[in-house]
UniProtKB/Swiss-Prot annotation:
The keyword Cell membrane applies. The keyword Cell division does not apply. Keywords: Cell inner membrane, Cell membrane, Ion channel, Ion transport, Membrane, Metal-binding, Sodium, Transmembrane, Transmembrane helix, Transport. The gene is fluC. It comes from Pectobacterium atrosepticum (strain SCRI 1043 / ATCC BAA-672) (Erwinia carotovora subsp. atroseptica). Fluoride-specific ion channel. Important for reducing fluoride concentration in the cell, thus reducing its toxicity. This is Fluoride-specific ion channel FluC. It is a multi-pass membrane protein.
Length: 127
């Protein structure tokens, strides 16, 4: 039990710091598109897709590794709450196109990145 808590703690800490750094470095570049949030969500989606495929192929690995990557790292890195707040701020300021683009890029992009990583890791581990 302690090792699982430690895995979540370590992964979450690394993911949260990475998300914060992405926001610091990229959110100010385009005021109508918070790139740091988008990058955090796309990278997290790619990582979790690859991790799911990898752990399906390696079920013998300690589950704490899966928890560290999926729940910890990806949970700390990706950010639905920040994304939601940004969309609401766009809507409240009348920036409907920016809100719509932000929703489209985050949702469609995250689904695409998860599927892409899953397919890539599956292909790499079977060839």
């Amino acid at each position: 039990m302690f090792s699982t808590l430690l895995a979540v703690f370590i992964g979450g800490g690394v993911g949260s710091v990475a998300r914060w750094q992405l926001g610091v470095k990229f959110n100010s570049l385009y005021p109508t598109l918070p790139l740091g949030t988008l990058l955090a969500n796309l990278i997290g989606a790619f990582v979790i897709g690859g991790a799911l495929a990898f752990f399906l192929r390696h079920p013998h690995l300690d589950q704490d590794w899966k928890i560290l990557i999926t729940t910890g790292l990806c949970g700390g890195l990706t950010t639905f709450s920040t994304f939601s707040a940004e969309v609401v701020m766009f809507l409240q300021s009348g920036q409907l196109a920016a809100a719509g683009l932000h929703v489209l890029l985050n949702l469609a992009g995250s689904l695409l990145m998860t599927a892409l990583a899953f397919a890539l890791v599956t292909w790499v581990t079977t060839h």
